[in-house]
Amino acid sequence: MSKQDGKLTGLFGAPVSDRENSMTAGPRGPLLMQDIYFLEQMSHFDREVIPERRMHAKGSGAFGTFTVTNDITQYTSAKMFSEVGKQTEMFARFSTVSGERGAADAERDIRGFALKFYTEDGNWDLVGNNTPVFFFRDPKLFVSLNRAVKRDPRTNMRSAQNNWDFWTGLPEALHQVTILMSDRGIPKDLRHMHGFGSHTYSMYNDKGERVWVKYHFRTQQGIENLTDEEAANVIATDRDSSQRDLFNAIENGDYPKWKMYIQVMTEEQARNHKDNPFDLTKVWYHGDYPLIEVGEFELNRNPNNYFQDVEQAAFAPTNIVPGLDYSPDKMLQGRLFPYGDAQRYRLGVNHWQIPVNQPKGVGIENLCPFSRDGQMRILDDNQGGGPHYYPNNQGVYDSQPEFKKPPFPADGDGYEYNQRQDDDNYFEQPGKLFRLQSDEAKERIFTNTANAMDGVTEDVKRRHIRHCYKADPDYGKGVAKALGIDINSIDLEGEQDETYENFKN
């Protein structure tokens, strides 16, 4: 029987005799427990909502195709980049970061930019954002960021005080905060923004030579943003504005595209780099490490079912393929465990069997035979009766030494090193970013900052003004004026930076 026959059954195939009237004792009597269809419907309904993502809960996604447009085989042996013109299927999910599933799309917030490439050597997940940097550089602060931007435990409301108290306790956050308070803090929609891998990653070629890389994805639709006032009007009329724009564009054949670029740094250049090249709060200047074109991806197919493909999409930085690798970036290293662990909690240990997460280029039957059982193991015959241990005398499931990675550079004693003794250059790059803005754009940064700090205590405002001033005096003066604070009343030249370790208000 097909869906087109229009005949209703229960979940196990039994025909449903009446969809509108419950089984009762008499026409007005109580319900009977033997109304199995009613019980089945309600029990399923009670359980159909899965945990939302702790961050990036509100998202939109689409399928597409990545095409190589430039030869980078000198840097990587990854098969998806093996020849110009080669195409790889992919899935993309964009998101806001702070809000819940029902949050408005046009909020001032970072956007998640997560890509899943179905390569012939397995899935490659690049889990990035629409900004090239982040608020901090040590992953021990991840949980506190979540707390600061989410709801207050007492009021259950999002708190600008908590947000800014956290940000201003970290002088290295100013770079990301400056981007967030700039015009690019509210993209008009998902099609008109850039994406970044943000972290430093690495590539290695067939000779075992490693280079450090950063990934960039430049929208081919152009950059378009919203002011605070425009965003408020959008939210008032359509809380799903970005999701609607992406879905409708693809549905109408207006397929969005992004060009992929990399920046490349050799190991020798990294050793001599002015700053820590693995610091997520800093960028590599394009003049020193120019963008190298790699390819282009196009999103050209909407999911048939949002829950099936977007809500159940699972991304993890640990999903990587031969020719691509990690770096000493502490923030990247700190993400390697929790992403997969969160998916196992949210979707189950066998979430890799969900269609959107399946490694299409490899084949389910060829996947790890030693990971078995678990809830909802529904594909691949649970690896059948073959050996589920190694070594075994059947000569199957041997290692593949030809895919060994080149040695990963690491040295030093295990210790909780003070990051601030290693690098306290917090303000150079946000200062340069500020000076790149037009006079009108600078004024909008001041206004946006004042709007975002509404309700924040004066000590926190002063702390932020001090950081802005150290990046550029005009930056500090402009923010102070917008906040209505006399800048001459602030100690602007204090030698001790105000970190969470040493607040001087």
Curated annotation (Swiss-Prot):
Q: How does it assemble?
A: Homodimer.
Residues the entry annotates as binding heme: 339
Q: Where is the active site?
A: 56, 129
Q: What family is reported?
A: Belongs to the catalase family.
Q: Which organism is it from?
A: Staphylococcus warneri
Q: What does this protein do?
A: Decomposes hydrogen peroxide into water and oxygen; serves to protect cells from the toxic effects of hydrogen peroxide.
Enzyme superclass (EC):
oxidoreductase
GO molecular function per UniProt? catalase activity; heme binding; metal ion binding
Protein's UniProt name: Catalase
Give the required cofactors: heme
Task: Give the residue ranges for region: Disordered.
Answer: 1-25
